[in-house]
């Protein structure tokens, strides 16, 4: 097998809005494709964003990747961005996380049919990193690489918290907003940075935090249903059951910021990497970036991370 050539720089790219209908339940899915203009991409990077995220927040990163020969596809998760049945569904995950994972598989299938026979790398950030590992349990053979950014550390309290959110979901189909619970979780992450504002734990760049605060697609209140699915995803991700490991040589990279409160400490990151290695994945690495917080793709020194991702992709064998 030959390896993908060193990625070439090209400042021209094409951006395409993509509308899909979920095969799972017909939910409208809003996606975005950013690809090199005038040449065939050397890889496809599929992005699974985090909680309260949306695909547009990754545009600078996707443009950079496309400029270096990597096509990017990203889809708003159900209950996020514009992947909604109605406007009031923002913060509500209709169909649950199983539907979300099948939506991700649908985007992979679209990428395979559109780009033809080039490596597909999945990048999951935060909640997206949980979804990516649940995806991996079923579909690891579809991927040529996996990148897990801002992975939440395993939390032994998740199982107990599921009982609370499960109870809340008994009422109004789990659509009740949970501002106090959401604020409590965020404040715990923000303890170290409280003097800088309520979202300082997310990123050290005030401009990034201001964008999140002022954008209605990223500043919204979660429902009991969304929190229940998030916790359920954590439990499912860190369960050693259900892993087929059909692609044991798959390159897997954990990438986190040194000051990422969601990580729960460097030991938990390395424990997550060791777990995957123990399951039978033979090419698992973990890297921690100094002076960076949760959103390493948006930090002030983000191009360090972007270039490491390009390097990771450039070493993936071509098909």
What label would you give each PLM region?
Residues 13-36:
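N-terminal cap/lid segment of alpha/beta-hydrolase-fold proteins
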Residues 49-53, 258-259:
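Active-site glycine-rich loops that stabilize anionic/oxyanionic intermediates
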Residues 62-87:
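Conserved alpha/beta-hydrolase
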Residues 93-112:
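Alpha/beta-hydrolase active-site loop
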Residues 115-126:
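Alpha/beta-hydrolase fold nucleophile elbow
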Residues 132-217:
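Alpha/beta-hydrolase-fold enzymes
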Residues 254-256:
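Short beta-strand/loop motif that positions the catalytic acidic residue
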Residues 279, 283-319:
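Catalytic active-site module of serine/aspartate enzymes centered on a nucleophile-bearing elbow/loop
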């Amino acid at each position: 097998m030959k390896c993908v050539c060193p990625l070439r720089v090209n400042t021209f790219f094409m951006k395409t809005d993509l509308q899909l209908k979920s095969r799972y339940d017909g939910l409208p899915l809003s996606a975005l494709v950013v690809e090199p203009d005038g040449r065939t991409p050397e890889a496809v990077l599929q992005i699974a964003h985090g909680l309260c995220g949306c695909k547009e927040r990754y545009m600078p990163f996707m443009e950079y990747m496309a400029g270096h020969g990597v096509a990017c596809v990203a889809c708003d998760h159900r209950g996020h961005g514009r992947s909604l049945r109605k406007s009031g569904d923002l913060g509500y995950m209709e169909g649950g996380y199983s539907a979300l994972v099948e939506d991700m598989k649908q985007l992979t299938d679209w990428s395979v049919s559109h780009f033809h026979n080039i490596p597909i790398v999945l990048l999951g950030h935060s909640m997206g990193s949980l979804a990516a590992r649940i995806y991996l349990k079923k579909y690891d053979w579809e991927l040529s690489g996996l990148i897990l950014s801002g992975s939440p550390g395993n939390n032994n309290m998740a199982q107990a918290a599921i009982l609370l959110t499960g109870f809340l979901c008994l009422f109004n189909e789990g659509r009740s907003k949970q501002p106090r619970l959401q604020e409590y979780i965020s404040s715990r992450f923000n303890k170290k940075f409280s003097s800088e504002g309520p979202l300082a734990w997310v990123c050290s760049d005030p401009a990034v935090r201001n964008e999140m605060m002022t954008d209605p697609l990223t500043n919204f209140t979660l429902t009991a249903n969304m929190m229940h699915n998030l916790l359920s995803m954590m439990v499912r991700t860190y369960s050693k059951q259900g892993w087929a490991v059909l692609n044991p040589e798959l390159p897997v990279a954990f990438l986190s910021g040194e000051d990422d409160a969601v990580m729960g400490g460097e030991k938990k990151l390395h424990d997550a990497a060791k777990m995957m290695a123990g399951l039978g994945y033979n090419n698992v690495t973990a890297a921690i970036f100094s002076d960076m917080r949760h959103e390493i793709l948006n930090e002030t020194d983000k191009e360090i991370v972007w270039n490491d991702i390009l390097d990771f992709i450039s070493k993936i064998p071509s098909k």
